[in-house]
Amino acid sequence: MRRCFQLCALVALLSSCGPNMGGELVGVDGRRATPETPPFGMVFVPDGSYTQGVGDEDVSYAMTATSKTITVEGFWMDQTEITNNEYRQFVNYVIDSISKKMLIDGGMDEFGISEDEFGNPVEPPVINKKARIDPRSEDQKEILKDLYYQGDETFYRRKEVDTRKLNYEFYWYDFTQAANKKNRYNFEKQKYEGNITKLDGKKEPIRNRGSFIMRDVVNVYPDTLCWIADFSYSYNEPWTATYFWQPQYDEYPVVGVTWKQAFAFCKWRTNLLWDFLTENGESPVHEYRLPTSAEWEYAARGGLKLNMYPWGNNYTRNKSGCFIANFKPLRGNYSDDGGVKTIAVGTYDPNDYGLYDMAGNVAEWTSDAFDESSYSLTHDLNPSYQYNAKPTDKPARKRKVVRGGSWKDVHHFLQCSVPTYEYQDTARSYIGFRCVRSLMGGK
């Protein structure tokens, strides 16, 4: 009995030494912060301030163009533009998901998950990513035949995926509308009172938190016909026929991608990582996204001040007289820089942050909407000018900022400070993109 009393006293003593000892505020116990793993294929861009826009050294434009000093927080950025092979992983994921959805609808329940880990029913069933499609199964072939071109749409009886069906459904949370004070939850009345604007431009009353979740569907296959559509009276059929699927172009930047397709790619890439982290018991990190125009310019400068080009000086040739980017160097001459059209990413030297092709090769989408007066409207801390264009908006409202210049542009568009634009639903043979990811915590 005495030993039992001593044991109880010891337990009570040890308990008093826990996180609530003395009734003090000590925080929640058991939380573990792990260092952020550097994302594969990305380089770190530290936070800092710089002069956005042209500098005083650019005499031609210093008196007419807007510039201001801003600060940008640190982030990770893709070392190169997204390549054909990287984007193909996205396309193949969509093909696999659509195929499994068709098999589930065809009665093959092994391709779906109808119960969660607690035994609760899941409706509709979630796609089972671990299930494998058997290309030799005649039953599966019969169900999946509608995914391929049929009848007179086939070319020499080749079995080819109908790219018109490669639609990716994705969601995101509209924090901007959720942060509007008129849209906040009214605790006194125990309800929402505001209205929210959906992607189709329609306004509807806020029902609950789900009203701020946006749903979109985008066809993910690149517009391979852009090589012909972009240039009249120019023979570019070989690039249209082979550029995206031919292995020799795997390390070339993906083109023919609209802003919305690039946006969808970022959402898919985020979910790909989050699913992996969740399965391994790790906490999610910040999402992948397109860089803001300010982030892109800051990264292009490579930590230098007021430089005209990413390589640090005001010239497009090195000491040997060779061009140091892929662009249109001379009138009617595309080849003197070493590439007529796009070339493999990372061919030229990187800037001081280790980023390749921040000038030339292909121009790059950013997340910002294009407006000539945006510099005077945006904040000086992490400036960002966002606008989700509605289908009914005028074309000018659908413009997105494009940076860096491309293989078909003259040197002016290669400057760090020069933004231009393209319409968000337009695909070009000279526009690609790269992703960024915000840094977790401080430096």
Where do the model's predicted regions map?
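Coil residues (strongly favoring Ser/Thr
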Residues: S97, E153, T163, F175, ...
